[in-house]
Amino acid sequence: MSKLSFRARALDATKPLPIFRGNDMPDLNDCVSINRAVPQMPTGMEKEEESEHHLQRAISAQQVFREKKECMVIPVPEAESNVHYYSRLYKGEFKQPKQFIHITPFNLDYEQPDYDMDSEDETLLNRLNRKMEIKPLQFEIMIDRLEKASSNQLVSLQEAKLLLNEDDYLIKSVYDYWVRKRKNCRGPCLIPQVKQEKRDGSTNNDPYVAFRRRTEKMQTRKNRKNDEASYEKMLKLRREFSRAITILEMIKRREKTKRELLHLTLEVVEKRYNLGDFGGEILNEIKIPKADKEIYAIPPSLHNGNHHKVPECKVKNTHHLNVKDEVLEIVRLKKKYPKKPKADILVTPLPQANSEPLAVINRSDIKQYDFQSSDDDEFPQVPSPLSELEEENDPDGSYAFRRRAGCQYYAPHLDQMNDTPETTDLSGLARHRNRHCLTTLTVPRRCIGFARKRLGRGGRVIMDRLSTEHDSVLKQIDPEMLSGFSSSSHIAQPPSSPSRTNASDRHCENRLSLPEILSNIKSCRLQCFQPRLLHTQDSDREECTSRLGQAVNLKRVSSSLLNTSKNGITVTGGITEEQFQTHQQQLVQMQKQQLAQLQQKQQSQQSLQQSHPKAQGSGSSDCMSKTLDSASALFAASAVVNSPAPVRSEVNKDQNAGHSNLNGVVQPSGTAKTLYSTNMALSSSPGISTVQLVRTVGHPTTNHLIPTLCTSNPQTLTMGNSCLANTVHLNNVSVVSPVNVHLNTRTSAPSPTALKLATVAASMDRVPKVTPSSAMSSIARENHEPERLGLNGITDTTVAMEVT
């Protein structure tokens, strides 16, 4: 505290001054209450420091004795100096350093440890150096790591091995020494540390208040006495005023919005009055919301390989409401186009994600008096109900077809559409085209299983494969074995009615075993497709391609007649390979004779027609009876017996000559044709000598033949519940093939006419001549009727022949 003092003021003449005599001088204690006394100034110390005992005693002694007493001072510890002890610790070899402040360079030097060795550590280090070399710095680093890793609890030996990258013996020796020294040490740590107080000033360990740590306080202006509490109050008041200003601005904006809404409502009423919309029809038309696109949770997979670039669609919460701005004007409604029904039933739409579309509120859905007023600020406003979305659920999603403005669209061609087998309104060739059959490829030569052919964009041929349980076995089948089956099959005719379903097809393709599938191929109940090869072997065949077709068909007829039956029917007798080769040579020689006669008599053909006018009318009908000689008739009569194994190799040779076929028929486009049972009438002109080959069916429970004969008169051949179809005319040979024959009744015995075939054929001793006109008519007839040529295959029937 400072002593009492007076402030110098100007004397006032109006106020009397007190006059004291020397003996009447008042004491010091009486002068304390004088009003002119200057208030005590702050000493610059805290209250605790001012009340400290030594400080108060020193101040009081100075005031009383008017001088400084040596005994009345703050005690300070004396500094003792022992020169001898100092000289013993620090030698007199001191050198003045060049600089006292050292700056650590910015390098990767290892940090020096905080632990310093003592004499006890040197003793241990000397003992360890006898067995291994260890430096003092290395020892200090080890002790320093152990000290810093331990707090109140010491680290274990295993943890010390992880901290110290040294030898196990050295680590164990240093660890044991460190633990023993740590326990003997009175302090908490072996490394001396400077005592540090807390920064908040809460430590009161120092007895002298003057040396305690000060707390950081906020500096305020002393003249206005703004302490920390008043400053905080001012900050709070500022925040409250800022909040009030923000609320006032929001209220101002709300009132402006309500005023604009009122003006817009008045404009809408005026416009409706001018348009005459007193019933609200135009207003309701405008209020119809626009259709929003659906939000899909899973992005559609792109087939261009850039799957890593597809952004993920985030699923939004359904409780959020988006207000969509919509102009309140007359909007033209979007024209809806009718969607065509999809014919493909196999293609099922992908399941949509379980994400509901986001709720959207349009401006037009809000009623004209749905705005808030100033009275109901505390109550939340409930929006008007949402309008119904009239958009249809399109299964195509974002890939749905949408017409663009300025584009002209044409109707699709119905003849180029690829229909699926499941369509019920298909009939004829359209249904036949979708049939799957066993397919063989040429390059590479292998079987790919069940497939169907269709024409793709740009004329490319596309094979649609059908997965079955026999794919692994069918791919291992030798294509040469299927070539023998397909070469003997006949033409598949379209069905008479579209009532036939695919149940039998799926049964034949998916539910049958492999032996049954091969049996169905041989019995013409299942198809086998092979691509056609268009290449010839020599130049002679390129000149007479149409003639070669006739010879090839004759060869296929002869090879089909030699096939055996698989239903247990055996017939005595047979032919050898030499006879078959002889018959083939005779057919080739016959064709060469016909070609030679055509070239020789080409110039004299007109004169022959004038000299024989009657022969022209009957030339086309007489050609059927003048094409077989006696040797060929005998060979055809013996064709009812089983054929040996080498015959199949001959058939394969004919196929490899450049005419691969589908079930024995050369198809122009390679499309497989289904097999159907239809009723066909076998007719021939009366009075014409014909040789007809008729297939007879062998019942699996009988051991005799059931021939079906074809006479010269028109008639319909029926047998049981099936009909004979596919009559093929090869000059004078007619082949009738049964399709899907099922015998439900007991068959009859063979007719006597069939038993006379051999004797009648042997009685033909003369060889009829072949006229050019008859040959030309027969060749022309075959060229114009390629689809009627059918061949017998490896079936469960035998063949009989009648010569009339």
UniProtKB/Swiss-Prot annotation:
Pfam families: E_Pc_C, EPL1. Residues 611-624, 654-669 have a biased composition (Polar residues). Residues 372-395, 484-508, 603-624, 646-669 are annotated as: Disordered. It comes from the Eukaryota. GO terms for cellular component: NuA4 histone acetyltransferase complex; nucleus; piccolo histone acetyltransferase complex. Belongs to the enhancer of polycomb family. PANTHER family: ENHANCER OF POLYCOMB (PTHR14898). This is Enhancer of polycomb homolog 2. May play a role in transcription or DNA repair. InterPro entries: Enhancer_polycomb (IPR024943), Enhancer_polycomb-like_N (IPR019542), Enhancer_polycomb_C (IPR009607). Keywords: Chromatin regulator, DNA damage, DNA repair, Nucleus, Transcription, Transcription regulation. It is found in: Nucleus. The keyword DNA damage applies. GO terms for biological process: chromatin organization; DNA repair; regulation of transcription by RNA polymerase II.
